[in-house]
Amino acid sequence: GVVTLLTVLFNWHRETTFVPLGVLWLTALLGGADDLLNIFYGKERHPRTLGRIARLIRIHRDVKLRIWYLISFPWQAYKRLFYLLGSHPGRGVQAHEKIIIQLIIGGIIAWWLSFKLDWTELWVPWLGHVDLGVLMAPVIIFLVVFLANAVNITDGIDGLSAGTLIISYGAFFAIALKQQSSDISLLTATVIGALCGYILFNIKPAKYQMGDVASLGMGVLLTAIAFALDRPILLPIIGAVFIIEIMSVILQTTSKVFLGRRLLRMAPLHHHLEITGKGETSIVMYAWAFSAIFAIIGIWLSFQ
């Protein structure tokens, strides 16, 4: 709310700040809906198995329902894929539903960059700009979804995600200043200020939690800012902690499904470190230091 208010009052540039703020709010609404359903309104879901649905398609007396089950079978198979990968039916917005909404949000950013701003080139250090053509839109959508969930997964220990977000946004703030992009630098400075105020109440013992409302939105906005500065290739470096966290979950899930064993005692990585005896404060401090090192590397690479 603070970021939106200050940006609208003092940094409103329709071409560069309208869409980032819009997708921030869309993603925050998604996270808010999930949190509210989990706390107040949601009901536990008990989905039918695919075998049961296939049987109903063949034998149900109501022809209309048989047609409905047949039409909705691909959607049911899509849901079961997520359950197979470790998602569980709960009371809030389900993982498969979140992905669909995030893909739509990624599509909005892809439209903004590819068609509104006519960007089809990806900057690469030392190589300059590489024209991706029609592949630019899928790259944008993938990074939006990936980073949103990466930041969300990192939000598991007091101060962990907030501190690393401050460092990551700080790196892009430095890049924006160097590029003399006043609107993006003001937007990132506003986000940093809001996060600095928040982290005072989020370090251990936390009085407030970020939750899906902020973590998903912060990940999407970070990606949008990286694209606005023509530096999305640096996201895996500047956001190294987020990438490591989500990759630990992906590798853990892949190992469980295909090899039948765990790589970590618990995913994401910060929970594994907790279980092995590392204190919360130590984990957070090491993550901040690691993030700062890679942020500096990212800033250096941005000028190559």
Predicted regions mapped to residue ranges:
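Membrane-embedded alpha-helical transmembrane segments of multi-pass integral membrane proteins
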Residues: 168-171, 248, 294
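Alpha-helix boundary/capping detector
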Residues: 222, 248, 252, 298-300
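Membrane-proximal soluble regions of multi-pass membrane proteins
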Residues: 51-80, 240-286
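Loop-to-transmembrane boundary segments
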Residues: 91-101, 276-287
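Final/C-terminal transmembrane alpha-helix of multipass membrane proteins
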Residues: 280-301
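"…together with the soluble PPM/PP2C metallo-phosphatase catalytic core" -> "…together
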Residues: 1-209, 213-243
